[in-house]
């Protein structure tokens, strides 16, 4: 079952010698799975029925283990668990952390809200156009080599954000550290989809700004031209988001895609 709305609005007004246009658009949708061919589960949260399409799912992280005593006194998460590893909530209370403890978390992995708004104005020969765009009500997981340094015994650089923010024995034993302990090789416990790696995909971006000046006709006509306009245009100038590691508009889990470029262009338009 899906429902939502899509709309746009524009308002034009002349104020003195200024021609002003304000515009906005928005697409919003929500859905719920009412019928799905799946086996019944003893845990209703494991089923798709009753939840949203593309609902993010994973374990509920409860910080990092501080010592071996805490590891022994917590539900089993498998072998090889060490201080600094992510600890998870035993949702079904069976004393073991496994797939039965994965629950719907966050929002959907596709934005349920997409919007934009802007303003345009003309005054004498000058003009300006500003446009913002954004997305909301979405979640995504960060993963891969970007946030799991040295996985599978690989070599490479570490993000600046990881350096100084990961759990380290005797250096940074904060149970709420931004990153778990580093390990050379695989660490399946820390790589699991969970609230630890879940991020808010909402953002708003200053997508386009254009400033222009059209030379008066009385000068242009002397050059046997129809019009001449100078302009300065910027694209992807500012982004406002809680997520700072890479461009949230990419929808990337690891930031390894080529980012959208910030560009500034100076141009001249000539009409013959």
Which role fits each region the language model picked out?
Residues 3-7, 113-119, 126, 206-209, ...:
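Hydrophobic, lipid-facing positions within transmembrane beta-strands of outer-membrane proteins
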Residues 1-2, 43-69, 162, 168-174, ...:
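C-terminal beta-signal and terminal closure region of outer-membrane beta-barrel proteins
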